[in-house]
UniProtKB/Swiss-Prot annotation:
This is UPF0342 protein Csac_0863. Belongs to the UPF0342 family. Transmembrane segments: none annotated. InterPro entries: Com_YlbF, YheA/YmcA-like_dom_sf. It comes from Caldicellulosiruptor saccharolyticus (strain ATCC 43494 / DSM 8903 / Tp8T 6331). Gene3D superfamilies: YheA/YmcA-like (1.20.1500.10). It comes from the Bacteria.
């Protein structure tokens, strides 16, 4: 029987070789080279995190909060480098979530890990 950690490293290496990861890495490097773009992305992510923290703390997230974040996204994503970064990041996050879900289902932890989220 193979060691699960060895298999996890194989999965990590496969992920690093995937087109999705390479696309994300290239987009990230482009953003990091431009201080203005980097700051725009950081400001957006900060606002996004504040909204998520508000939601997790049970505070009301108003339609105005959501609209403000959507407007900011629309503005910054007019820049093709930022749009590429955000969309490639979203795709990579989806892959990681899918992998986590596949593993949870395979070891019968789906209800424990995802059941609470689905019941809300």
């Amino acid at each position: 029987m193979r060691n699960v950690y060895d298999i996890a490293y194989e999965l990590a290496n496969a992920l690093k070789e995937s087109n999705e990861f390479k696309r994300f890495k290239a987009a990230k490097e482009k953003i990091e080279k431009d201080e203005k773009l980097k700051q725009m992305v950081m400001d957006f992510k900060k606002k996004q995190l504040e909204l998520e923290q508000k939601r997790l703390q049970g505070q009301e997230v108003t339609s105005s909060d959501v609209y403000s974040l959507q407007q900011l996204y629309q503005i910054i994503s007019l820049n093709p480098d930022i749009e590429e970064y955000l969309s490639s990041e979203m795709m990579l996050a989806k892959i990681l979530a899918d992998i986590s879900k596949i593993i949870a289902e395979a070891v019968d932890l789906k209800d424990e890990m995802f059941g609470l989220l689905e019941s809300k």
